[in-house]
Amino acid sequence: LKYLDRHITPRIKEALKFSPIVFLNGARQTGKSTLVQAIAKDLPSGGDPAPYVTLDRPVLLASASSAPEAFLTGYHGRPVIIDEVQLAPALFRALKIVVDEARTKEGDSASGKFLLTGSANILALPKLADPLVGRMAILTLYPFTAAEATYNISGGIERLLRLDFKNVSDRGFSLMDVIKKATFPEIVEASVENRRTWFDGYITSILQRDVRQISELEKISLLPHLLSVLATRVGGVMNDADIAREVGLSSVTGKSYRGILKMMFLTLDVKPWHRNVGKRLVKSAKGYLIDTNLICHLLDYNIDDVALTKPGLFGSLLENFVATELVKQLSNSDVKAELYHFRTSDGIEVDFILERPDGSVLAIEVKKAETVNMGDFKGIKVFQELVGKDFIGGVVLYSGKDVAPFGNNLWAVPFSVLW
């Protein structure tokens, strides 16, 4: 696979202009190392590309852990890239000291000194993140978006929020092709068999090795089973007691272990939308996995077979695909919006809500069928009535090819608007 320009690159370069430390986190194998090494060429360090060091190397890890300040000052104030930084927790306090000294000496020119990467969500590790409040910009790199994987520029989420559906085209890529490609860079072009082998190794290395490095879990062997159970529940409201019971854990432990999977960027939660609107709303998050192909692997299904023989599961996979696309595109772009789901206690629901900082909201429903009718807007119309003037519009994403209006700011739009 040739190097694909990642859509988050401008955000990283912009952050390096203003922040002394930029932390790029994300799951293992999302392409962080490749990306930061490409950026290193544009980060001059005494005329050369910025040095790149990875703490996966035992000697460098020993140095960073036992003499963190010496490790950092050894670069004499030049920009440096440090990969897998969560492996050396001692570095974070040392970074604070080194950055504060640089700010005292250099003022604004202390920006862009450290570009860090890590495979665990730094915000879930407050002991590490707290010393660097106000000194560090945090960005997240996910697996390929649909647009990245099909060599297009970004912009799907912007089009949705503007209700700009002119010239929506699949550009010759089928929905199934795109779901398979919008995955981890290493397996974009891999065969079904090679993907299976890769995912087996990937899950083992994260759940057996990486988790041990940041957390002491008594029943670590149950994590793969927990991940598989969550794969059967994608798009469902998360009930921690129920999930824990199925895995064989107490409710408290189950919730904690689910937090670990989220921290390693294997799963994600979509929070419930809430506002004082005079209706009782469900207050639990919906759960998804970070990669739709990973779900198929865990359930031992080929996605093409699922589409033909298991319509219910295929609907859940499509919802997972849209959830991850929205999360990835929000992470990559400057669009300011939060992702939620909407569900009332009497069962009226909308799959996704995008809320802008000004309170304006877009409702998105996912439908696997190739046609749309007015009934598919039922939940969206209830939501529209509740939010009134804050309603931007409602979109039903579906498997057909035509954009069609269904009322004032209500649209049926092909999935291909995402790529």
What annotation goes with each model-predicted range?
Residues 1-16:
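Pre-Walker A adenine-sensing motif
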Residues 92-116, 130:
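Conserved catalytic/switch belt of AAA+ P-loop NTPases
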Residues 32:
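Conserved lysine of the Walker
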Residues 48-79:
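Short glycine-rich substrate-engagement loop in P-loop NTPases that contacts/grips substrate
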Residues 35, 39:
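Hydrophobic positions on the alpha1 helix immediately C-terminal to the Walker A/P-loop
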Residues 125-232, 236-237:
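Interdomain motor-coupling "hinge/lid" segment immediately C-terminal to the ATP-binding subdomain
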Residues 188-361:
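Accessory nucleic acid-recognition modules appended to NTPase machines
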Residues 399-419:
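Domain-level recognition of nuclease-like catalytic cores that cleave nucleotide substrates
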